[in-house]
Curated annotation (Swiss-Prot):
Function, in words: F(1)F(0) ATP synthase produces ATP from ADP in the presence of a proton or sodium gradient. F-type ATPases consist of two structural domains, F(1) containing the extramembraneous catalytic core and F(0) containing the membrane proton channel, linked together by a central stalk and a peripheral stalk. During catalysis, ATP synthesis in the catalytic domain of F(1) is coupled via a rotary mechanism of the central stalk subunits to proton translocation. This protein is part of the stalk that links CF(0) to CF(1). It either transmits conformational changes from CF(0) to CF(1) or is implicated in proton conduction.
PROSITE patterns the record matches: ATPASE_DELTA
Protein name: ATP synthase subunit delta
A GO term, aspect molecular function: proton-transporting ATP synthase activity, rotational mechanism
Quaternary structure and interacting proteins, as annotated: F-type ATPases have 2 components, F(1) - the catalytic core - and F(0) - the membrane proton channel. F(1) has five subunits: alpha(3), beta(3), gamma(1), delta(1), epsilon(1). F(0) has three main subunits: a(1), b(2) and c(10-14). The alpha and beta chains form an alternating ring which encloses part of the gamma chain. F(1) is attached to F(0) by a central stalk formed by the gamma and epsilon chains, while a peripheral stalk is formed by the delta and b chains.
Disulfide bonding pattern of the chain: none
Organism the protein comes from: Rhizorhabdus wittichii (strain DSM 6014 / CCUG 31198 / JCM 15750 / NBRC 105917 / EY 4224 / RW1)
Keywords: ATP synthesis, Cell inner membrane, Cell membrane, CF(1), Hydrogen ion transport, Ion transport, Membrane, Transport
UniProt membrane topology term: Peripheral membrane protein
Length: 184
């Protein structure tokens, strides 16, 4: 398998690698990717689901029942549903967000793409995402999958991270640089 040591070195990366291997064997990479995107949205939008994944007070049985019900209501594919059960059984639901990111990286690499983690102060429009992908494609000479995150604390602009490279064009970064320069 063509995984980087960085992904395999982390706990979430090992889970993502295992899920990716199963999805590839079952020719279900696209279905699992879609299910994981639904779960990512649920983590972002639902306080209850986020608490379920992070609370140490939830028992294994309760967590397994809750993720099964959540998977059914979100229309999650069977492989991802079983995987959620494994995470719940092993008390690793707190790793779900990182597993989703790692799986996205593995999936993009499988398609011959590079993944760019993009942080913006406000949600980007489809047109902005398309323009960003086109610009990154010309810079990198390959297709780019974009993993979007919204963080109002950057005030404006973008932070783009591709592998170990980071381009920080945020207003927060510019203001910090200006403050340091003014201190002299």
């Amino acid at each position: 398998m063509e995984n980087s040591g960085g992904i395999q070195a982390s706990l979430s990366g090992r889970y993502a690698t295992a899920l990716f291997g199963l999805a590839r064997d079952e020719k279900a990479i696209d279905a699992v990717s879609a299910s994981l995107q639904s779960l990512k949205a649920a983590l972002t939008e639902s306080d209850d689901f986020r608490r379920l994944t992070t609370s140490p007070l939830v028992s294994r049985d309760e967590a397994m029942k809750a993720v099964a019900a959540t998977a059914a209501s979100l229309g999650i594919d069977p492989l991802t549903t079983k995987f959620l059960g494994v995470l719940a059984q092993n008390r690793r639901l707190g790793q779900l967000g990182a597993v989703i990111r790692s799986f996205g990286t593995l999936s993009a690499r499988h398609r011959g793409e590079t993944t760019a983690e993009v942080t913006s102060a406000h949600p980007l429009t489809a047109t902005q995402v398309k323009a960003l992908k086109a610009k990154l494609k010309t810079q990198l000479d390959r297709d780019v999958a974009v993993d979007l995150t919204v963080d109002p604390s950057i005030l404006g602009g973008l932070i783009v991270k591709i592998g170990s490279r980071q381009i920080d064009g945020s207003i927060r970064s510019k203001l910090n640089s200006l403050a340091i320069a003014m201190k002299g």
